Regions:
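Core catalytic alpha/beta fold that binds nucleotide/phospho-ligands
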Residues: 1-240
Length: 240
């Protein structure tokens, strides 16, 4: 694990295997660093705000991205989106395109929700956020596939959530350990991103048992990486 201090943002870095990079940072640190003082949003607010490029200390969003942000109905969604975009753009610029301006690094989404770089669609990337953290992953090998998820660990979910998110076999293995429940959940969601289907695939068709993934009862040959952050967050990556 390493750290990059950039514009008063502490960016934590991981490399679970050669060629794969994970960055994660706190959303409040990002917002304090990217907005001009007089334009900093009130994070206690609920309704959305209409942002302009000049609200940011240094432009890093395109006009199209500003329009996307202003289409969201909740400020929380806007802030998560802005923070995630800032982190992954910094990552891509730092690792791949040091001479490219941040507002020229743009992402789009495939039909079922998987993100990709518009100018380099074959470069593997993945995004996630939860509460105070946003995370991004990329891979130097264009032939690899990755999926990333981060979640805040709360109390053990209720019975309805457990039966919706996990199979009976998974529930028997998980017991009532909140940390392991959320860890398995991040692995499952990371795998759904890995196959580029997200929640378009049934949660009951994917099982995580003893750190192994089964899809339609077939064991999947993938690498699974998980780590706990600040004792109350867990981050997982699924890769080739």
């Amino acid at each position: 694990m390493g750290s990059i201090f950039q514009n008063k943002i502490s960016i934590n870095t991981l490399s679970p295997q050669p060629g794969i990079m994970i960055w994660y940072a706190k959303i409040p640190e990002i917002t304090r660093s990217v907005f001009k003082k007089d334009a900093h949003p009130d994070l206690r607010a609920v309704l959305n705000e209409l942002f302009k490029r000049q609200d940011f200390i240094k432009p890093f969003l395109s006009h199209e991205e500003i329009n996307t942000i202003n289409g969201f109905k909740a400020l929380k969604k806007q802030i998560e989106w802005i923070s995630g975009r800032y982190l992954i753009k910094q990552m891509i610029q730092n690792i791949f395109f040091s001479n490219t301006c941040l507002d020229q690094i743009n992402l789009s989404y495939r039909k079922e929700g998987a993100p990709f770089l518009t100018t380099h669609p074959d470069l593997p990337v993945s995004l996630s956020h939860s509460n105070d953290y946003t995370a991004a992953a990329c891979c130097k090998d264009k032939g690899q596939t990755i999926g990333l998820d981060i979640e805040k660990i709360a109390k053990a979910p209720d019975c309805f959530f457990m039966k919706t998110a996990f199979t009976q076999n998974e529930i028997l293995n998980l017991k009532k350990d909140a940390a392991q429940i959320f860890r398995n959940w991040t692995i499952k969601e990371a795998y759904l991103k890995y196959i580029k289907k997200g929640f378009n695939e049934s949660l009951q068709k994917v099982e995580v048992i003893n750190n192994e993934i089964f899809h339609n009862k077939n064991k999947i040959n993938v690498n699974v990486f998980s780590t706990f952050i600040d004792t109350d967050y867990v981050l997982s990556l699924v890769s080739d």
